[in-house]
Amino acid sequence: MRWSVLDTVLLTVISFHLIQAPFTKVEESFNIQAIHDILTYSVFDISQYDHLKFPGVVPRTFVGAVIIAMLSRPYLYLSSLIQTSRPTSIDVQLVVRGIVGLTNGLSFIYLKNCLQDMFDEITEKKKEENEDKDIYIYDSAGTWFLLFLIGSFHLMFYSTRTLPNFVMTLPLTNVALGWVLLGRYNAAIFLSALVAIVFRLEVSALSAGIALFSVIFKKISLFDAIKFGIFGLGLGSAISITVDSYFWQEWCLPEVDGFLFNVVAGYASKWGVEPVTAYFTHYLRMMFMPPTVLLLNYFGYKLAPAKLKIVSLASLFHIIVLSFQPHKEWRFIIYAVPSIMLLGATGAAHLWENMKVKKITNVLCLAILPLSIMTSFFISMAFLYISRMNYPGGEALTSFNDMIVEKNITNATVHISIPPCMTGVTLFGELNYGVYGINYDKTENTTLLQEMWPSFDFLITHEPTASQLPFENKTTNHWELVNTTKMFTGFDPTYIKNFVFQERVNVLSLLKQIIFDKTPTVFLKELTANSIVKSDVFFTYKRIKQDEKTD
C-alpha cells in the first residue's frame, strides 16, 4: 500500500476525534461491551458476558467484536509486561476504538489508492495511444478524496465508534468498492454479500447494485453475478451461524433475525418514519456542508470511467432501495458516502489540473475547491466541539471514580440509572474490583430494583432532587447530593447579537476588535463560554448513614 503525508494526516484527524470524545453511547454499547467481555473473560467462558444479562430485543453479531478484540489483544499483552496499575480500563477502551478507527482509516486509504491506480492506468494507456495529443490528467484525484474525507464530520467522528456500521462493515465495503475500481467485480460481489449477511443486511442493496451494474456495463455475466453473490451469502451465513450461535447459546443468524423483527414486523418504524425522499433532501445535505462535493458529482460522473460509474450507480441504487424503508438513519447509507466523494474527487481533480486559468471566473471556480474544504473542516470542528459534550454518563462515571479513589472508598455499591448508561457508561470505565471492591449495578427491573435499593451506597441518576428518587419516603432524606454532571442543551444568541449590533460599528471595526483588540483565540473562547448552554442532567448521591444524620 502506497503511503503519503496526507494518509498520516487522515489517521491523525481520526485519532483527534477519538481523544476529544472518548466515551460511547447506547447505539455502540453492544459491541463495546462484547469486546470488553472477550478481552476480560476470553471466548471460552461466556457465563459472565454482559449480553446474557441484557440480551436486547434481537441477537446481534459477535463476529466484528471478536475481530476487534483479537486486534486489540497485543496491547493487553504489552501492558501486562509493563505491569502498571490502572484504576480503570478506559485506556483499553480507547485502544479498542482506536483499532476500529484504524480499520476504517486504512480502508479509506486503500480506496484512495485504488482510485489513483485506476486513473494512472487509464492515463498511461491514453499516452501510449495518443502520443501527440493533450490528455486529461487526474494525478490529484486521490488527494482530493482524502481532503474531502478529512473535512467530513460524520466519517471522522464515527470512524472510531463501535456502531455496527463501522465495526468491520464500512472497512470491508470500502475494500469491495476498491476492488470494483480495480476490475475485480466477482470478488467485490462476493465480499459485499458476505458483509451483508454477517454484519449489516442493508449492505445487500449495495452488493446487488454492484452486481446489477457490473452486468449492465458488460463486465461480468449474470450467471457470475448471481454465483458469487450466493457464494458470499453462503460463506457469510456459515460464519455467522457458527460464531453467533455459540455466543447466544441458541441457533441464530442475527442479521436475518433483525430484518424479520425491524423490517418485516415493522418495529423499526416505532423509532420514527420519514418521507421516501429524506435521504436526498435531508441526510445527504447534512453530511455534505457546504454541498460542493454533491455539486461536483454531476461533473464527476460525466468524466468517470466505467469502473467508477459502476461504483457510483451501485451506491445510488443502495440509497434508493433504503429510501423505501420508512425508518431512516444517516448511518444506513454511510457505505455510499465514500463513492460520492470518489466522484467529487474526480470532478475536483479535473478542474484543478486541466482547467486553463485565463479568466477570472476560472480562478474563482478553482478557489472554491480549497475554500470549500477549509469550510467543511471548520464546520466539522464546530460539530466536534458540541458533540464531545453529549456523553454526560461517561463524565458522571469518571467523576464518581475519581471521588472513590481520592477518598479511598472501598467495598461499596453504586446504582446507575438507564440515562447515564445510555450516554457513556461502559464496563471499561469501572474501577478494578480487586483493588476497590466497587459494584456497579444497572438493574432495570423495577421489582428487583426495589428489593436491592437498601444495599446501594451511591446513585448516579437523572433525578435532580433526592425527593424524586424511587422507593423513598418523601419526608425523609436518605441521600446527599455529592456531584452534578452537565450536558450541552442549546445556544444562547445574546452575546453574538450584542457584539454584532453594537452602536456605531461596521464590518471592518468588528474585524478589528476580533483580530487586534481581542485576538481570534480570546474571541472564540468568549463566544463559546457565553453562547453554549450546558445544564445539569445527571446527579450523584451518597447514602446518608444514621450516625451522619445524628451528627
Curated annotation (Swiss-Prot):
Pathway: Protein modification; protein glycosylation
GO BP annotations listed: dolichol-linked oligosaccharide biosynthetic process; protein glycosylation; protein N-linked glycosylation
Cytoplasmic side: 24-61, 111-136, 200-202, 249-275, 325-331, 387-417
Family as reported in the entry's similarity comment: Belongs to the glycosyltransferase 22 family.
Further remark: Present with 3550 molecules/cell in log phase SD medium.
Function of the molecule: Mannosyltransferase that operates in the biosynthetic pathway of dolichol-linked oligosaccharides, the glycan precursors employed in protein asparagine (N)-glycosylation. The assembly of dolichol-linked oligosaccharides begins on the cytosolic side of the endoplasmic reticulum membrane and finishes in its lumen. The sequential addition of sugars to dolichol pyrophosphate produces dolichol-linked oligosaccharides containing fourteen sugars, including two GlcNAcs, nine mannoses and three glucoses.
Protein name: Dol-P-Man:Man(7)GlcNAc(2)-PP-Dol alpha-1,6-mannosyltransferase
Species name: Saccharomyces cerevisiae (strain ATCC 204508 / S288c) (Baker's yeast)
Top-level taxonomy: Eukaryota, Fungi, Dikarya, Ascomycota, Saccharomycotina
